[in-house]
Amino acid sequence: MTKYAQGKFRPKNPDKYIGGSMPTYRSSWEFHFMKFCDENPSIYKWASEAIKIPYRNPFTGKQTIYVPDFFIHYVDQNGKQKTEVIEIKPEMHTLKEKTGRNRRNQLHWALNQVKWEAARNWCKSKGIAFRIITEKDMFHTGGR
């Protein structure tokens, strides 16, 4: 069985973190993003798993909840305040062509699409952005 990096993150700048206790990271990528949020001077507030977005599961037909990984407030390069909801995902979970013939991967991809559409709609109604960040975005891999 694969071991995943998990643990509690201790912010160096706890005044920036929105939440009552130390956030939990569920992957090394989430850990790196928490560190980025904590140390980046442009990010003035951030939260982990703080938002609940309702959506209908297309496989069960039941109403359920999607909890995106992060919620951040920052100042962009033009000095404008921005807010984003962020999901950290491996690229293979974001591209249909990367699912291959594996049925489980295909179902996982399809469910992600429904969750992310709900997140986009929720964010649009609040005037904020939704972004999916992959390893290519975080670590600039893939020839960029």
Name each model-derived stretch.
Residues 1-144:
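Electrostatic, structured charged patches in enzyme active sites and in nucleic-acid/phosphate-binding
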